Amino acid sequence: MALENLLHPTNIKIDEYAKNATKFSFEALERGVGYTLGFALKQTMLYSIAGACVTSIKINDGKVTSLEDVIPCDETVADIILNVKSLSVTLAEDVETGTITFELSGSEEEIFSEEAKLSEGLAITEEVFICSYNGGKKLKIEAKVEKGVGFRPAQDNFKDCEFLLDATFSPVVFCDFEIKDARVGRRTDLDKLELNIKTNGNVNCEEALRLAATKIQNQLRNIVDIEEINKGIFVEDPKDINPILLKHVEELNLTARSSNCLKAVNIRLIGELVQKTENELLKAPNFGKKSLTEIKDKLSELGLSLGTLIENWPQDL
């Protein structure tokens, strides 16, 4: 079958069946394409979309060191850790880390997330119950918030006076897909792809799907043009390339924010970076004008610029 005759989904339905939960259906697709797309989108949404979350918690300035310690509230230490960990948070574009603080004293009361003191650039997007404070003794809860991509397991349970947490950065909290039979005319050997997506509210489901599709598209862009692949891309010896282009982007000494943005889109070498346009970089998650300006300035110091075509760039580095 000619590539141009492959079916593309023409019947697309969007069903927002609950808050921050949407089911998407796409039909009709060639047999097998539904599974291929569904699996790729699911994995990308769960593990490759950037976000922010609580990564560690300190109680009473680190004096509480065990889940068995007694604190002045109805909940256990473990309960409070789980409640604080469940907070949906966002960090401003130019902020990499933040702090959430609860300082409790006086009479007993129920404490919710809206009573927290937040560092600059940090926001809590949904109200969450934290604890039932019993009054009397003071109670201080500090939570560290970081940006990241995918999942990062805690290397220890408790370190440096803090309870360390497994970090799930993706704003997509659930994604699954199902393949059903579809029909077009007399053809009954087709796929219908149904995607079920739930987010924490920091990104809506449609935006999460778009981000995932864009990431997959960027990964595949070098093999989209079949004619170029058939011709074969033969490159010159790397020694003929400016050695600066073969250095890792870490040698530019960028800020953590800019470095993380480049890692998120798999830009490892300076040569890969200079071949990107400004618009391409601005489409990367959490990549803003400050990062763009910083990168342009660093490249300029080396006599380089964005949007540079490198004809003999090795594709297998």
From Swiss-Prot:
Domain of life: Bacteria
UniProt-listed SMART domains: RPOLD
InterPro entries reported in the protein's UniProt record: DNA-dir_RNA_pol_insert, DNA-dir_RNA_pol_RpoA/D/Rpb3, DNA-dir_RpoA, RBP11-like, RNAP_asu_C, RNApol_insert_sf
Keywords: DNA-directed RNA polymerase, Nucleotidyltransferase, Transcription, Transferase
Region annotation Alpha C-terminal domain (alpha-CTD): where it falls in the sequence: 241-317
SUPFAM superfamilies per the UniProt record, alphabetical: C-terminal domain of RNA polymerase alpha subunit, Insert subdomain of RNA polymerase alpha subunit, RBP11-like subunits of RNA polymerase
Enzyme class at the top of the EC tree: transferase
EC number from the UniProt entry: 2.7.7.6
Keyword Nucleotidyltransferase: yes
NCBIfam families tied to this protein: PRK05182.1-2 (NF003513)
Family according to the record: Belongs to the RNA polymerase alpha chain family.
Protein name: DNA-directed RNA polymerase subunit alpha 2
Organism for this UniProt entry: Francisella tularensis subsp. holarctica (strain FTNF002-00 / FTA)
